Protein backbone atom coordinates (compact mmCIF):
# COMPACT_ATOMS: atom_id res chain seq x y z
CA UNK A 1 0.00 0.00 0.00
CA UNK A 2 1.10 3.54 -0.67
CA UNK A 3 1.66 5.92 2.23
CA UNK A 4 1.38 9.68 2.74
CA UNK A 5 3.88 11.87 4.62
CA UNK A 6 1.54 11.54 7.63
CA UNK A 7 0.95 7.77 7.72
CA UNK A 8 3.27 7.19 10.71
CA UNK A 9 1.51 10.02 12.59
CA UNK A 10 -1.89 8.37 12.10
CA UNK A 11 -0.60 5.02 13.34
CA UNK A 12 1.10 6.63 16.37
CA UNK A 13 -2.19 8.38 17.22
CA UNK A 14 -3.99 5.04 17.23
CA UNK A 15 -6.07 5.62 14.10
CA UNK A 16 -8.01 2.73 12.59
CA UNK A 17 -6.21 2.34 9.27
CA UNK A 18 -7.64 0.91 6.07
CA UNK A 19 -6.78 0.74 2.38
CA UNK A 20 -8.38 3.50 0.32
CA UNK A 21 -7.48 4.12 -3.35
CA UNK A 22 -4.29 2.13 -2.83
CA UNK A 23 -3.24 4.20 0.20
CA UNK A 24 -3.03 3.22 3.87
CA UNK A 25 -5.42 5.85 5.26
CA UNK A 26 -6.96 6.68 8.66
CA UNK A 27 -10.70 5.88 8.81
CA UNK A 28 -11.24 7.13 12.37
CA UNK A 29 -9.40 8.13 15.55
CA UNK A 30 -11.73 9.02 18.46
CA UNK A 31 -14.80 7.84 16.55
CA UNK A 32 -16.73 9.07 13.51
CA UNK A 33 -19.47 10.91 15.43
CA UNK A 34 -17.01 12.68 17.76
CA UNK A 35 -14.79 13.69 14.82
CA UNK A 36 -17.81 14.83 12.77
CA UNK A 37 -19.09 17.08 15.57
CA UNK A 38 -15.56 18.41 16.20
CA UNK A 39 -15.46 19.68 12.61
CA UNK A 40 -18.98 21.16 12.86
CA UNK A 41 -18.27 22.96 16.14
CA UNK A 42 -14.51 23.52 16.37
CA UNK A 43 -11.69 22.41 14.06
CA UNK A 44 -10.49 19.11 12.62
CA UNK A 45 -7.57 18.10 10.39
CA UNK A 46 -7.80 15.62 7.51
CA UNK A 47 -4.84 14.12 5.68
CA UNK A 48 -5.88 14.32 2.04
CA UNK A 49 -2.41 13.84 0.58
CA UNK A 50 -3.74 10.90 -1.44
CA UNK A 51 -5.57 13.31 -3.80
CA UNK A 52 -4.10 13.77 -7.29
CA UNK A 53 -2.62 16.97 -8.71
CA UNK A 54 -1.95 17.70 -12.39
CA UNK A 55 -0.43 20.88 -13.80
CA UNK A 56 -1.71 22.16 -17.14
CA UNK A 57 0.51 24.86 -18.64
CA UNK A 58 1.38 26.73 -21.79
CA UNK A 59 -0.40 28.63 -24.58
CA UNK A 60 -2.77 25.69 -25.21
CA UNK A 61 -3.73 25.14 -21.54
CA UNK A 62 -7.05 26.97 -21.72
CA UNK A 63 -8.11 25.40 -25.04
CA UNK A 64 -7.38 21.94 -23.64
CA UNK A 65 -9.32 22.55 -20.40
CA UNK A 66 -12.28 24.04 -22.27
CA UNK A 67 -12.49 20.79 -24.24
CA UNK A 68 -12.10 18.24 -21.42
CA UNK A 69 -14.05 19.96 -18.60
CA UNK A 70 -17.74 20.82 -18.36
CA UNK A 71 -17.43 24.21 -16.64
CA UNK A 72 -16.30 27.44 -18.30
CA UNK A 73 -12.60 27.73 -17.44
CA UNK A 74 -12.39 30.97 -19.45
CA UNK A 75 -14.41 32.63 -16.67
CA UNK A 76 -11.62 32.01 -14.13
CA UNK A 77 -9.24 34.77 -13.07
CA UNK A 78 -5.93 34.11 -11.28
CA UNK A 79 -6.53 33.09 -7.68
CA UNK A 80 -9.97 31.60 -8.35
CA UNK A 81 -11.04 27.95 -8.16
CA UNK A 82 -13.75 26.11 -10.07
CA UNK A 83 -15.62 22.86 -9.40
CA UNK A 84 -16.07 20.89 -12.62
CA UNK A 85 -16.05 17.42 -14.15
CA UNK A 86 -14.50 15.51 -17.04
CA UNK A 87 -17.47 14.30 -19.16
CA UNK A 88 -16.86 11.11 -21.15
CA UNK A 89 -18.14 10.30 -24.64
CA UNK A 90 -20.97 8.08 -23.36
CA UNK A 91 -22.80 10.62 -21.21
CA UNK A 92 -21.02 9.72 -17.97
CA UNK A 93 -18.33 11.32 -15.84
CA UNK A 94 -14.63 10.38 -15.83
CA UNK A 95 -14.15 12.29 -12.55
CA UNK A 96 -15.17 15.43 -10.69
CA UNK A 97 -12.35 17.83 -9.83
CA UNK A 98 -11.20 21.31 -8.90
CA UNK A 99 -9.41 23.67 -11.31
CA UNK A 100 -7.06 26.27 -9.75
CA UNK A 101 -6.18 29.21 -12.00
CA UNK A 102 -2.66 30.43 -11.27
CA UNK A 103 -2.29 32.59 -14.33
CA UNK A 104 -3.76 32.54 -17.87
CA UNK A 105 -1.38 29.77 -18.97
CA UNK A 106 -1.00 27.82 -15.71
CA UNK A 107 -3.66 25.70 -13.98
CA UNK A 108 -3.66 23.07 -11.24
CA UNK A 109 -6.20 20.23 -11.40
CA UNK A 110 -7.04 18.39 -8.16
CA UNK A 111 -8.58 14.98 -8.84
CA UNK A 112 -9.89 12.08 -6.77
CA UNK A 113 -7.32 9.66 -5.37
CA UNK A 114 -9.03 6.55 -6.77
CA UNK A 115 -9.00 8.05 -10.28
CA UNK A 116 -5.46 9.45 -10.60
CA UNK A 117 -4.24 6.94 -13.19
CA UNK A 118 -7.51 6.93 -15.14
CA UNK A 119 -7.69 10.75 -15.16
CA UNK A 120 -4.05 11.13 -16.17
CA UNK A 121 -4.49 8.71 -19.08
CA UNK A 122 -7.70 10.51 -20.07
CA UNK A 123 -5.96 13.90 -20.12
CA UNK A 124 -2.91 12.63 -22.02
CA UNK A 125 -4.98 10.79 -24.63
CA UNK A 126 -7.22 13.84 -25.24
CA UNK A 127 -4.43 16.42 -25.34
CA UNK A 128 -4.51 17.04 -29.10
CA UNK A 129 -4.04 20.77 -28.36
CA UNK A 130 -0.52 20.16 -27.06
CA UNK A 131 -0.87 21.65 -23.57
CA UNK A 132 2.01 20.94 -21.17
CA UNK A 133 0.80 18.29 -18.70
CA UNK A 134 2.61 17.29 -15.51
CA UNK A 135 1.48 14.74 -12.92
CA UNK A 136 2.60 16.03 -9.50
CA UNK A 137 0.42 13.70 -7.43
CA UNK A 138 3.41 12.16 -5.62
CA UNK A 139 5.14 15.51 -5.05
CA UNK A 140 2.39 17.23 -3.06
CA UNK A 141 1.05 16.76 0.45
CA UNK A 142 -2.30 18.15 1.53
CA UNK A 143 -4.10 18.84 4.81
CA UNK A 144 -7.72 19.99 5.01
CA UNK A 145 -8.19 22.07 8.17
CA UNK A 146 -11.95 22.37 8.54
CA UNK A 147 -14.47 23.87 10.94
CA UNK A 148 -15.58 27.26 12.28
CA UNK A 149 -12.40 27.64 14.38
CA UNK A 150 -10.04 26.69 11.52
CA UNK A 151 -9.40 30.31 10.53
CA UNK A 152 -8.51 31.27 14.13
CA UNK A 153 -5.96 28.48 14.42
CA UNK A 154 -4.41 28.95 10.97
CA UNK A 155 -4.18 32.74 11.20
CA UNK A 156 -1.53 32.32 13.91
CA UNK A 157 0.74 30.65 11.34
CA UNK A 158 0.79 33.24 8.55
CA UNK A 159 0.93 36.98 7.91
CA UNK A 160 -1.52 36.52 5.02
CA UNK A 161 -4.97 37.80 6.02
CA UNK A 162 -7.03 34.62 5.75
CA UNK A 163 -10.31 36.53 6.12
CA UNK A 164 -9.45 38.22 2.80
CA UNK A 165 -9.48 34.87 0.95
CA UNK A 166 -13.11 34.30 -0.16
CA UNK A 167 -14.68 30.88 -0.73
CA UNK A 168 -13.25 29.10 -3.80
CA UNK A 169 -10.25 31.45 -3.85
CA UNK A 170 -6.62 30.67 -3.03
CA UNK A 171 -3.28 32.32 -2.44
CA UNK A 172 0.31 31.03 -2.35
CA UNK A 173 2.71 32.18 0.33
CA UNK A 174 4.55 31.61 3.59
CA UNK A 175 2.78 29.42 6.14
CA UNK A 176 4.21 27.92 9.36
CA UNK A 177 7.66 29.08 8.25
CA UNK A 178 7.42 27.25 4.91
CA UNK A 179 7.34 28.96 1.50
CA UNK A 180 5.10 28.18 -1.50
CA UNK A 181 2.19 26.81 0.50
CA UNK A 182 -1.15 26.90 -1.34
CA UNK A 183 -3.82 28.21 1.06
CA UNK A 184 -7.22 27.43 -0.44
CA UNK A 185 -10.63 28.41 0.95
CA UNK A 186 -12.23 25.10 -0.02
CA UNK A 187 -13.32 21.89 1.65
CA UNK A 188 -15.58 18.87 1.51
CA UNK A 189 -17.32 19.40 4.85
CA UNK A 190 -19.59 22.46 4.64
CA UNK A 191 -18.11 23.63 7.94
CA UNK A 192 -15.72 26.25 6.54
CA UNK A 193 -11.94 26.15 6.67
CA UNK A 194 -8.98 25.82 4.36
CA UNK A 195 -7.05 23.24 2.39
CA UNK A 196 -3.25 23.49 2.46
CA UNK A 197 -1.00 22.07 -0.29
CA UNK A 198 2.76 21.85 0.23
CA UNK A 199 5.89 19.85 -0.59
CA UNK A 200 6.22 16.58 1.35
CA UNK A 201 9.42 17.80 3.06
CA UNK A 202 7.36 20.51 4.80
CA UNK A 203 4.77 18.01 6.06
CA UNK A 204 6.25 17.33 9.50
CA UNK A 205 6.65 21.03 10.38
CA UNK A 206 3.19 22.01 9.10
CA UNK A 207 1.41 19.17 10.92
CA UNK A 208 3.13 20.11 14.21
CA UNK A 209 2.42 23.84 13.78
CA UNK A 210 -1.25 23.32 12.89
CA UNK A 211 -1.92 21.10 15.92
CA UNK A 212 -0.10 23.47 18.28
CA UNK A 213 -1.99 26.48 16.89
CA UNK A 214 -5.31 24.67 17.18
CA UNK A 215 -4.86 23.22 20.66
CA UNK A 216 -6.79 26.02 22.41
CA UNK A 217 -9.69 25.46 19.98
CA UNK A 218 -9.97 21.71 20.62
CA UNK A 219 -8.34 20.62 17.36
CA UNK A 220 -8.44 16.90 16.52
CA UNK A 221 -7.29 14.68 13.66
CA UNK A 222 -10.21 13.40 11.56
CA UNK A 223 -10.42 10.28 9.41
CA UNK A 224 -12.12 9.44 6.13
CA UNK A 225 -15.20 8.10 7.94
CA UNK A 226 -16.22 11.54 9.19
CA UNK A 227 -15.14 13.08 5.89
CA UNK A 228 -17.86 10.95 4.31
CA UNK A 229 -20.61 11.77 6.85
CA UNK A 230 -19.76 15.49 6.66
CA UNK A 231 -19.91 15.61 2.86
CA UNK A 232 -23.13 13.60 2.83
CA UNK A 233 -24.84 15.99 5.28
CA UNK A 234 -24.05 18.74 2.75
CA UNK A 235 -25.32 16.71 -0.21
CA UNK A 236 -21.87 16.75 -1.87
CA UNK A 237 -21.38 13.96 -4.43
CA UNK A 238 -18.78 11.24 -3.95
CA UNK A 239 -17.25 9.76 -7.10
CA UNK A 240 -17.78 5.99 -7.18
CA UNK A 241 -21.05 6.33 -5.24
CA UNK A 242 -23.16 9.22 -6.55
CA UNK A 243 -21.12 9.83 -9.71
CA UNK A 244 -19.47 7.36 -12.07
CA UNK A 245 -18.77 6.72 -15.75
CA UNK A 246 -22.49 6.05 -16.36
CA UNK A 247 -24.03 9.06 -14.52
CA UNK A 248 -24.34 12.30 -16.44
CA UNK A 249 -23.76 15.68 -14.76
CA UNK A 250 -27.34 16.64 -15.69
CA UNK A 251 -28.80 13.58 -13.93
CA UNK A 252 -26.55 14.24 -10.93
CA UNK A 253 -27.82 17.79 -10.46
CA UNK A 254 -24.54 19.22 -11.72
CA UNK A 255 -26.08 21.29 -14.51
CA UNK A 256 -24.64 24.34 -12.70
CA UNK A 257 -21.10 23.19 -13.56
CA UNK A 258 -22.05 22.27 -17.15
CA UNK A 259 -21.77 25.46 -19.21
CA UNK A 260 -23.07 25.53 -22.77
CA UNK A 261 -21.38 28.82 -23.65
CA UNK A 262 -20.64 29.83 -27.21
CA UNK A 263 -17.36 28.48 -28.54
CA UNK A 264 -16.88 25.88 -25.77
CA UNK A 265 -17.16 22.56 -27.62
CA UNK A 266 -16.44 20.22 -24.72
CA UNK A 267 -16.58 16.42 -24.84
CA UNK A 268 -20.16 15.12 -25.20
CA UNK A 269 -21.68 18.60 -25.24
CA UNK A 270 -24.48 17.74 -27.74
CA UNK A 271 -25.78 14.84 -25.66
CA UNK A 272 -25.67 16.80 -22.39
CA UNK A 273 -27.34 19.80 -24.04
CA UNK A 274 -30.12 17.48 -25.21
CA UNK A 275 -30.53 16.11 -21.68
CA UNK A 276 -30.71 19.63 -20.28
CA UNK A 277 -33.52 20.62 -22.66
CA UNK A 278 -35.43 17.32 -22.85
CA UNK A 279 -34.87 15.94 -19.35
CA UNK A 280 -33.32 12.69 -18.11
CA UNK A 281 -34.70 9.26 -17.19
CA UNK A 282 -33.49 9.57 -13.59
CA UNK A 283 -32.44 12.25 -11.12
CA UNK A 284 -30.18 12.34 -8.08
CA UNK A 285 -32.17 13.35 -4.98
CA UNK A 286 -31.60 13.71 -1.27
CA UNK A 287 -33.93 11.99 1.18
CA UNK A 288 -34.50 11.74 4.93
CA UNK A 289 -35.83 8.65 6.67
CA UNK A 290 -39.33 8.86 8.16
CA UNK A 291 -39.07 5.33 9.58
CA UNK A 292 -36.08 4.32 11.70
CA UNK A 293 -33.29 2.86 9.62
CA UNK A 294 -29.99 3.64 7.94
CA UNK A 295 -30.01 3.64 4.13
CA UNK A 296 -26.90 2.13 2.55
CA UNK A 297 -25.26 2.26 -0.88
CA UNK A 298 -26.96 -0.21 -3.23
CA UNK A 299 -30.31 -0.50 -1.41
CA UNK A 300 -33.27 -0.42 -3.80
CA UNK A 301 -35.67 2.55 -3.76
CA UNK A 302 -39.31 1.54 -4.28
CA UNK A 303 -42.73 3.21 -4.37
CA UNK A 304 -45.72 2.45 -2.10
CA UNK A 305 -46.61 -0.53 -4.29
CA UNK A 306 -43.12 -1.96 -3.91
CA UNK A 307 -42.12 -1.30 -7.55
CA UNK A 308 -38.47 -0.37 -8.15
CA UNK A 309 -37.97 3.36 -8.79
CA UNK A 310 -34.25 3.75 -8.20
CA UNK A 311 -31.23 3.03 -6.01
CA UNK A 312 -29.48 4.49 -2.95
CA UNK A 313 -26.00 5.77 -3.84
CA UNK A 314 -24.96 7.17 -0.41
CA UNK A 315 -26.50 6.82 3.04
CA UNK A 316 -25.66 7.19 6.72
CA UNK A 317 -27.01 8.06 10.13
CA UNK A 318 -26.63 11.85 10.30
CA UNK A 319 -24.49 12.68 13.37
CA UNK A 320 -26.02 16.16 13.69
CA UNK A 321 -29.65 15.26 12.90
CA UNK A 322 -29.64 11.73 14.38
CA UNK A 323 -31.80 10.42 11.52
CA UNK A 324 -31.05 8.32 8.47
CA UNK A 325 -30.17 10.43 5.41
CA UNK A 326 -29.16 9.52 1.90
CA UNK A 327 -28.91 10.29 -1.78
CA UNK A 328 -29.98 8.19 -4.71
CA UNK A 329 -31.23 8.14 -8.28
CA UNK A 330 -34.99 7.97 -8.84
CA UNK A 331 -37.34 8.20 -11.81
CA UNK A 332 -38.13 11.89 -12.47
CA UNK A 333 -41.75 11.59 -11.28
CA UNK A 334 -40.45 10.76 -7.77
CA UNK A 335 -37.82 13.53 -7.65
CA UNK A 336 -40.02 16.39 -6.41
CA UNK A 337 -39.25 17.66 -2.90
CA UNK A 338 -41.84 16.32 -0.45
CA UNK A 339 -42.45 13.06 -2.34
CA UNK A 340 -42.64 9.98 -0.12
CA UNK A 341 -40.51 7.05 -1.28
CA UNK A 342 -39.51 3.76 0.35
CA UNK A 343 -36.21 1.99 0.85
CA UNK A 344 -36.10 -1.78 0.60
CA UNK A 345 -33.91 -2.67 3.58
CA UNK A 346 -33.40 -6.43 3.42
CA UNK A 347 -37.08 -7.02 2.61
CA UNK A 348 -38.46 -4.32 4.91
CA UNK A 349 -40.11 -1.36 3.19
CA UNK A 350 -39.11 1.77 5.15
CA UNK A 351 -40.52 5.22 4.41
CA UNK A 352 -38.44 8.28 3.49
CA UNK A 353 -39.16 11.73 2.08
CA UNK A 354 -37.37 13.55 -0.75
CA UNK A 355 -35.67 16.75 0.49
CA UNK A 356 -33.31 19.31 -0.97
CA UNK A 357 -29.83 19.04 0.63
CA UNK A 358 -27.99 20.20 2.65
CA UNK A 359 -29.35 18.06 5.48
CA UNK A 360 -27.34 20.10 8.00
CA UNK A 361 -28.81 23.59 8.04
From Swiss-Prot:
SUPFAM superfamilies: Aminomethyltransferase beta-barrel domain, Folate-binding domain. One of its GO terms (cellular component) is cytosol. It is an enzyme of class 2 (transferase). GO terms for biological process: glycine decarboxylation via glycine cleavage system. InterPro entries: GCS_T, GCS_T_bac, GCST_C, GCV_T_N, GcvT/YgfZ/DmdA, GcvT/YgfZ_C, TrmE/GcvT_dom1. GO terms for molecular function: aminomethyltransferase activity; transaminase activity. It catalyses: N(6)-[(R)-S(8)-aminomethyldihydrolipoyl]-L-lysyl-[protein] + (6S)-5,6,7,8-tetrahydrofolate = N(6)-[(R)-dihydrolipoyl]-L-lysyl-[protein] + (6R)-5,10-methylene-5,6,7,8-tetrahydrofolate + NH4(+). Its EC number is 2.1.2.10. Keywords: Aminotransferase, Transferase. The glycine cleavage system catalyzes the degradation of glycine. The glycine cleavage system is composed of four proteins: P, T, L and H. Belongs to the GcvT family. HAMAP family: GcvT (MF_00259). This is Aminomethyltransferase.
